[in-house]
């Protein structure tokens, strides 16, 4: 049961953070999804979601942006 809860929490966080990222960086959700996939942001979210979801959303968004920027993203 704990694994199901953790998976549910992870899905909820990812579903929340991608539109927040889109709003913060003036993209629509689809553009944000492709941007995050292309520049490593989604892999970062997927791997570190547990830490990101406990952080202030502005810091989490900045961390995700920094990962993308280091991988060639220029938004």
Spans of features found by a protein language model:
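Long, compositionally biased
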Residues: 50-75
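Amphipathic, hydrophobic secondary-structure cores in small proteins
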Residues: 22-24, 28-55
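Short hydrophobic/aromatic-rich motifs at helix boundaries and adjacent loops
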Residues: 1-5, 33-36
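N-terminal acidic leader/helix
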Residues: 2-26
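Short amphipathic alpha-helical segments, especially helix-boundary/capping motifs
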Residues: 6-10, 37-42, 66
């Amino acid at each position: 049961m704990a694994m199901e809860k953790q998976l549910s929490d992870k899905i909820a966080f990812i579903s929340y953070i991608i539109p927040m990222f889109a709003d913060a960086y003036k993209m629509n959700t689809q553009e944000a999804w492709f941007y995050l996939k292309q520049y490593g942001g989604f892999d970062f979210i997927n791997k570190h979601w547990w830490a990101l979801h406990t952080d202030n959303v502005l810091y989490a968004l900045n961390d995700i942006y920094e990962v993308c920027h280091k991988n060639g993203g220029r938004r």
